[in-house]
């Protein structure tokens, strides 16, 4: 401590002084060196050692090393001593030493140097590192076909004193890559002995494509060692490379890979590779070295049977390979083993999932039996879905237990399945062959068959199937002792004579596994036996009652026991016995002439084996006056009959039946029912729907048979096929009486339940009556349920009316066809009389009432319908002032417009009586077509309407004196009142005075003559003639009408009111007189007589 302090103080002082001044650099370096040496020497004296390291590779020896102290040569070490250890000092010349492993705990170690220096330190196992020796690779080989590296090395476990766990790391390098492509850890156990290890690694890159190097290191894990455990150094690299010895450029070749996996394929080429593809899919190129490239294929699908092509294209060539992708074999499923003959064992299985690999790459199956050591191989070049494979192995003598292992193997892997069986419990026999049948008697036969196999140690169970026509199959089990390749015999009894049987056989072991297949069928007819029963017999008396007819049924096959050849019939009474000659089959009827005595009839059937027991029946029939007749309806082809129990019946009941339409005696069939029965169901294929059958129930007593009940029935009711025939018995004005006949039983086809009668009004062949439907409201329907009724009166009808009548019968089976008729009811005379009298009485009453009313109202009727016509002279409306009418141009109503007359007539003689003419207004062209053609067209005018003209000749003395005749033309002006009829004594009155109102103008014949006397005279004789101013008329106007027959100028003028109407323009102002219709027509015109209209 003093030395250390001494060296420390100058150093501090020096630093302190350096803070105040700057010393020189050499002095500073010298001080530091001296300080370091002092501290190191002081530490050696105190036993403090730095950088001491100890390692071990086998936990037996520790290898310790340390650096030499400063100023001490490594060769000056004298010894090293370990305290508390025998022989603790070791002579040394270097700074490292190997010492035996120390016990756990701290140990003091002293190192002495020749120069007197000494170093001490504490050593513990925790400070020691366990570093194994560098491992050595024994061999590195390669399987280029599978791209697999095979590595071998030795763990040198004998160098370690204790068993330990070792961890190995293997790294694989691919040239030219420097980083490992694989780094794998492996665990082993060091047992204290040298042990070799091997490891296989498959490269994704084919080994041919690059140089591969392998190096390993290891780590020992000994739990009791408390020091550091470190990895060893990596072993030197071991290389593997491919020496090209083929022309192949693409690797791997014909590789089998797992479907869905990834793989790398490379191409070694001296020229540039352009592309790489699998199938039609191009993949990117991976450059390895030089021109060598590779492609990665991801998720490879299952390939076709021919594989998937991989192609590399270079500048001058194309290279390729084939890849087969599939699956490893599935575990064999449903593995089962059995034997057919205890000589060979057959194992079958289902391959499971299809691998997708075929040919030499398909799955190979190996069946190995571990007890006997026998094996068999199965190899199939194709795979089929749901196919069953099988292999056969020979059985060893006296070996029952067999342990089978089935291994499935293909290039992608292998699986296996195992099974243990007892062969005697897995016996599935072969199909029995050579089945034969041999007679023993009519009810027993012997069956024999051959069965291959060695069954001496087991019992067999065989099933015999017995089948006959129209019967259920019968199966019988037979147990027998097994034999070797033997024929087996079995007796089959309880058979029916003369019956065809079909036999077949199958067998199994007594410890049942499964049945064999059925043998071929064998048909066989048993021999005949005597009939077991006599025929079922019945008897009927003939219609005349003199002969007895015997009926019998053919015996069933199970009772005939053979082919019936003939029948023997005999009848016996207390007085005599009769036997008929032999009746050959198939006749089943015989007739015997007997009297009224009681006979017992006997019938015997005979076949080649003998005769049957006789069947007997009594001929006597006990009368019964109390017989009821009932109705019955069946279902399908059967009918049920019932009756009350009769204690007097001592033997069977007999029910016979026949078609109702057949004549007596009729017999279709019969059955016998035990005497304790009260009903039975009769079933027969001869029953037909819609046919009536008679059923007769006979009771049997010791004296004979008695008829107890008669039943009529149908198996099924149908609708009648004909309509009832009906006629009209009587007709009246309000009713019709119809009558119909019964329908024959054969055509009724069921029990008659009633009639439906339709009627309505209607004529024949009208659409309304062609078919009657009850849905129409005007159709009347009567349902007649009393089937005994055969007439019907229809009341409340109308007389002399046609009715449509329809009649239909019906059963439970439906409605029959309809029969229609048209009937007309008679006329009702009382109604006709009433129909005549009522209108006559009404007419008389109406006439009387009308006459009374007309008489009382006659004045009103006259005024309304036929009033008096007033005198025009008294009409003030027509009394015009002359001064007003003359010379006034403003009065256009009285102005005469020119009008073309339709007729002009010139009177040459004055002796002709006055003539009044009312003609139609026509065109002059139509009146005189001959003359109009010569007339100037300019003078022609068409008049659509002009009032008719009344011409009247008036004798004028003044005119006569002047030497000419004058003509006056009148225009008929229609009066508003009906003219009154004139008496015959008034016809001689002056024509001028009776001409009525005739407005006119009289023109002188000579216009130059102005004789006022003549005018005044004319006014007096002609009456009232309103006229225009004569002086203002232009008689020579071209528009004036002129006569074409003479040179005289005769002009006609229109009405003083209008030239286009016959009505007055100024109506009468008398309020009591009727008013004219403004439309030019009045009710009075209807009663007016106009000549020539």
UniProtKB/Swiss-Prot annotation:
Q: Do you know which CDD domains this protein is assigned to?
A: FN3
In this protein, the residues bearing a glycan are 165, 200, 239, 262, 386, 403, 422, 441, 454, 477, 568, 648, 659, 676, 725, 783
How is it placed in the membrane, per its record? Single-pass type I membrane protein
Name the PROSITE patterns on file: FN3, HEMATOPO_REC_L_F2
Pfam families associated with the record: fn3, LIF-R_Ig-like, LIFR_D2, LIFR_N
Using the record, list the residue span of the signal peptide; answer none if the entry has no such feature.
1-43
Q: Where is this motif: Box 1 motif?
A: 865-873
Task: Map out region (Disordered) in residue numbers.
Answer: 908-941, 1003-1093
Which parts of the sequence lie on the Cytoplasmic side of the lipid bilayer?
851-1093
* Residue ranges occupied by any Fibronectin type-III domain in the UniProt entry: 45-127, 331-428, 431-530, 534-625, 623-715, 720-829
Extracellular side of membrane? 44-829
**UniProt cross-references to PANTHER family, sorted A to Z:** CYTOKINE RECEPTOR (PTHR23036), LEUKEMIA INHIBITORY FACTOR RECEPTOR (PTHR23036:SF105)
Domain comment from the record reads as follows:
The WSXWS motif appears to be necessary for proper protein folding and thereby efficient intracellular transport and cell-surface receptor binding. The box 1 motif is required for JAK interaction and/or activation.
Name this protein carries in UniProt: Leukemia inhibitory factor receptor
- Give the organism the record lists: Rattus norvegicus
